[in-house]
Amino acid sequence: LTLKEIKIFDCGSLNPDVLRFPQPPRKNIPGEKIPTLQEVFDLLAEYPNNNIWLNIEIKISPEFKVTAPIDVFVKAVVQVIEHNNAANKVNIQSFDWRVLESVKIQAPYIKTAALLGQSTFKSINDSVPSPWLNGIHFENSGGTALAILHEAQNYIDIFSPSWRLIMPKDSLFLGNTVNELKNNGFPVIPWTINRTKTMEKVILQGVDGIITDYPDSLLMVMEKMGIKRR
């Protein structure tokens, strides 16, 4: 799609999932369009005294060749960040770890966050790694979250896994607690946590942040637990 075509979509009213995002509490804003990254920075410029950090995700699938080449995609994003002198106010995250390596090659001063899903770490077979991990074979590397992070430590600053992967009692636990990951230099920001009970559980585990569709719920939990906003 061209930018002109994307701008036709009314993202302020059309709800792709009424079960996940019921109304209320979701509020309609008719006519709202999908912004470009530059338009997001323009909006932030209206609030210069607010400490706002952008978590920018580059969505590329190694399984479907439907986007621009990785280096081209990354370069376009980095250029907008640098144009706005915002390198110290962003991090770039991606499920495709090749993206993160490209970011560090092009702009080593920009922080990166490695997204990891409940299936993206799984190798194809004994000799072929997951296409998402930039050539790292999960099982052959040691079969833990920390093992694959150590192999990618030159281009990963933050670990952002599905929250179930860091919960010791969960069947999907990848072998390392939040404290172990943090003690090895990897801040932990799990996704996507929308239930308040789960928010409380991961906060007690010591996570550095939470990705959620409901920041208002997270703020309520933080207030209940006596946690101040940074």
Regions found by a protein language model. Give the residues of each.
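Metal-dependent phosphodiesterase/phospholipase catalytic core, i.e.
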Residues: 1-120, 132-136, 140-148, 154-156, ...
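C-terminal active-site rim and adjoining tail of enzyme catalytic domains
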Residues: 115-116, 122-230
